[in-house]
Amino acid sequence: MTETYDITIIGGGPAGMFAAFYAGMHNAKTQLLESLSELGGQVNALYPEKTILDVAGLPAINGRDLIKAQREQLTQFPLTIKTGQEVTNVTANEVGFTVTTDAGTTQTTAIIVAIGNGAFAPRPLTVPGAEAATGKQLVYSVPRLADFQDQTVMVAGGGDAAIDQALMLEPVAKSVTLLHRRAQFRGLAHMVDLLHASTVAVKTPYLIREVAPTATGQLKVTLKEVGSQTATAEQIVDKLVVSYGYTSDHHTLAGWDIDLAETRNLINVSQTMETSVPGIYAIGDGVTYPGKQPLIATGYGEAPVAVQSIMTQFFPDRRGPMHSTSLTPQS
């Protein structure tokens, strides 16, 4: 017999996890599906050591601790959580949707898509020597600060992630250099101020032209000054962290038998977070609407909107109050 749910949440990152919690507050029978082996999405997979500053009420928290707290929050309700299961198809039927994963099928009244930017992969450094150094001296994330203890580190990139990584590495590394191809950084003004007040050496405007291993197991990074035909420089580092951003792939959506309207690989949603397909809602970094900000905090705000909209539309007899102080977790 096919298991039936009120709400199916696809994607177990911060926004999807909070949507599951809020659905639990409404006593909705809910399943949370995550393709990775554990919950947490990109935060847990790529930025567990990153200090997160934009969650209300928390002066600072790293990604690992944030996801741990959200996992604990979910234990208040009898939610069905399935990790390591990728959704391969969604089909509409007379009572809602059939959700197919690589482990089987379930039935659901409504869906909340919270897959962020979909499948993500780092934008690679495409210069001579980069491929051979990848996974050794050249990395694309900082999952463990201890791996950089007392090392000479270069971070390449000019956005928030690059600045965050440079500042995060400063207390543990022997030295940190932040390399950017422009004179100005794209990060938030506060983070740029913290950067300039730190001991991180800022090197602009330079591009990486080539990397090569040294006899001592380090990496020689050859740089070219932007705007100059001849000016070059070399720097020997223990680790090169490339932070050029991530490419996204919504192949999960493309394989479904329903057509979700997308703009620039982002899902268009209404003010109730509903997509172009009635009964399917979307939240988090993978959606777009006027004024949208791609922040964890924004996803936390979108989750209750989507859940409340579903309860109002499909379960009006038990939509419940809208304030958490009026909602009681199941014992």
From Swiss-Prot:
GO terms for molecular function: ferredoxin-NADP+ reductase activity; flavin adenine dinucleotide binding; NADP binding. SUPFAM superfamilies: FAD/NAD(P)-binding domain. This is Ferredoxin--NADP reductase. Binds 1 FAD per subunit. It catalyses: 2 reduced [2Fe-2S]-[ferredoxin] + NADP(+) + H(+) = 2 oxidized [2Fe-2S]-[ferredoxin] + NADPH. InterPro entries: FAD/NAD-bd_sf, FAD/NAD-binding_dom, Fd--NADP_Rdtase_type_2, Ferredoxin-NADP_redctase_2. Its cofactor is FAD. Its EC number is 1.18.1.2. Keywords: FAD, Flavoprotein, NADP, Oxidoreductase. FAD binds at E34, Q42, Y47, V87, F120, D285, T325.
